[in-house]
């Protein structure tokens, strides 16, 4: 597998996964792995990974969670290329496909998936300093897509009873819950991530069910990077 001069190949999980990433551009964070482990998955599920990036969530689901098939959708051409090469590098062509496209204009049919997972850009467009590296800026700030865009796509892609899982800042949970409900996505599972036992919550992982009944299960918290502190 050829890589470009500005890329690296990194190995994870005792050699189970090899990942092509840019040396300096947008590299996946542990958030993606925590989300991929959090989402409720059945072996027969058909999964869509929105904003797939280099493909890390799709790859983890295929290798560690053994899902039947994952389709990744990625806006940026360079990241789409990396995701496709990562699939080939790990010989997972029969379990993962990646499409370049915009989640605001879905290239898949309605009701395509049992599960949608998304590690969206969650820094508000006007909050903080915008990274001059465009790939990082799009991945981290609500520049190209908003929370409503993500929920619109999730609702469109899911079959009734299907599940959407995402990760978002803990201090925006009330906003996420309210907007999920306006999209008929009932919050069903919640797990909070703390930097350490002495700090306020930083992130939250939420799973909603399309047209689900009310009732929220709150899972034990995660501190730091959880089991991914050593990879």
Predicted segment positions?
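Conserved Class I SAM-dependent methyltransferase catalytic core
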Residues: 144-201
